[in-house]
């Protein structure tokens, strides 16, 4: 009998392989909850991190194909729920958790991705009001980006036809959910800006779950909406649904039907607005006519009493003469003071030569002063004559003196400006430069150029 039974001796590789088989067979689909730490994402695209709790930790790896499908970005300190399997990395003798799927703890992955992208774009200013373009009040051509087979396009067309059938609609059919939907929506927005020549766009779809609406939460769609030169109305889902596209768009409509109602006014609304503007125009014209009538009445009152106008003109002429007299008197005083100063200067300096020269200067200055004074007087007289002639020309009495007359319609004594104020048998008072006469209208003739022989 052998003291020691036969021993089975394993190599390190064999032992590691056995351990790997046991772990991978028994831990093939496992859900694990923990907190992320040591997160790394190298150029390879793989995701490396440690999942830990208060008592232990495990290394995790998520290969690039799975990592690219993530809707959100994990961060250190974030709580995760992961699904995967245990594998052994034989070269180091380590075991690790190969993650196939993960989601944030306490909130869905899509909801977290929505929050993260919303915060990112808000910081970049994509939601700012200064970027919002005004929606045209009466567009001629409307572009629609939605599914060609969904209920949304039928709702939009029905509303547009009911409210304003003359508007032209260009439809760009796209996928609105599933793989590639975001790419098609963004491309359609870009194409409308490049070729569509539309006045406004409606981008949207009918209701659905968060997953169904997710294409409108993609960053590429948000940036296409932001870069659009054409105003965009976002109409995704129902009234309670909000997407990233809603925040970036120039206007958010709760439903596709509401978007159609916002983009065009009904014929009744337009007719009501036209009637409102017509009423305002009539009021404005009436106010202008009333103001003009008041001014005309003021002028008419002034013409009825020409003595008032003559009185004002006479006062102006009196003021001119008073200023003229003061100017002449002041100039004479100045010249007199100058002569007196020269005399005093001569008295102080008595040599005969200086006296003679001073006398000659005094005579010369006196002559110049007299000439200048006469010139001033002549200019003031000429100015007074000109003003007097102008006043005479402006005077209604002067007009009468030149052979004209003024016709007043009796009994109101209203000045007659046109024959249309007259009727047969009307009594008139004619004012002449000297005297007045009364007459009666026997006939009327519209042609002012005709003469009676």
Curated annotation (Swiss-Prot):
Its EC number is 3.1.11.6. It is an enzyme of class 3 (hydrolase). GO terms for biological process: DNA catabolic process. Its main location: cytoplasm. Heterooligomer composed of large and small subunits. Bidirectionally degrades single-stranded DNA into large acid-insoluble oligonucleotides, which are then degraded further into small acid-soluble oligonucleotides. Belongs to the XseA family. This is Exodeoxyribonuclease 7 large subunit.
